[in-house]
């Protein structure tokens, strides 16, 4: 279930209504009046949830699946008896519409400081700070001018939140430092096709920032699609870094400016990223790995290795290839001209 501190539950909704919304057919004998209370991904589905299946790599985990599941016709037979198949041409789009119907992000509200905000002793608030309903701020924390802290956010002790920072759907540990203009907890980039065009997929997760993390100015960290985006203890992130939904960053990592981490990347402890490094989605970066500046990582990097280039590869291979290309470009042909010289 989405964290109730951040999301309102709008259900329950009858199964027949969700099926109609997603353009799905109820199987014969299914109880259309059955109440569905939440949308969930497969790993978290329960008897009163609706989920979806689009990739057969998840089949081994379906044995105990319950509730209802949007599927294409070819996959309906693989669902266990305890799960109701909702057959549709677009399971992901149907799930997105169901999630929008069942859940809604909590609003900040009209009060600059909501009446139920909890501030421990020694908290300092700059001019124009907005604190939404249910916000909790730990002892000795400073929040700079015009920062906006969304509903339900918890900030630990001795934190420093810079001017114009936006925090939402987030839980912060102690001694976290966030520089001016950073945006934490906005929806991750997720869309799928629908009958009337693209549909935004609701992002129902959170951002967890552990103790001692530093986040640079104008950096953005998206909340999870359903699970959490996690920034590990004592990790240091430079300005203008983008971290997408569901990313899990280990402890003591370093990311230089303009690094971009795509969705669902796993980063081990002590990994380092040079400026403008980019990582494709669902890649694993091992503990202690190093990624060179401007590298484009398209596959897993083993622990302790250093990679560079585009596409990224072990640094020695990349340096050898770069040196070879330079030599070939400067070779003189039979006419005495350089290979790269058309003059």
UniProtKB/Swiss-Prot annotation:
Pathway: Bacterial outer membrane biogenesis; LPS lipid A biosynthesis
Record-level GO cellular component terms: membrane
Keyword hit for Lipid metabolism: yes
UniProt catalytic activity: a UDP-3-O-[(3R)-3-hydroxyacyl]-alpha-D-glucosamine + a (3R)-hydroxyacyl-[ACP] = a UDP-2-N,3-O-bis[(3R)-3-hydroxyacyl]-alpha-D-glucosamine + holo-[ACP] + H(+)
SUPFAM superfamilies reported for this sequence: Trimeric LpxA-like enzymes (SSF51161)
EC numbers on record: 2.3.1.191
One Pfam family in the UniProt entry: Hexapep
GO BP term, pick one: lipid A biosynthetic process
The keyword Ribonucleoprotein is annotated on this UniProt entry: no
Gene3D superfamilies according to UniProt: Hexapeptide repeat proteins, MurE/MurF, N-terminal domain
UniProt KW keywords: Acyltransferase, Lipid A biosynthesis, Lipid biosynthesis, Lipid metabolism, Repeat, Transferase
Molecular function as annotated in GO: N-acyltransferase activity
Family: Belongs to the transferase hexapeptide repeat family. LpxD subfamily.
Subunit architecture: Homotrimer.
Protein name in the entry: UDP-3-O-acylglucosamine N-acyltransferase
Organism listed in the record: Phenylobacterium zucineum (strain HLK1)
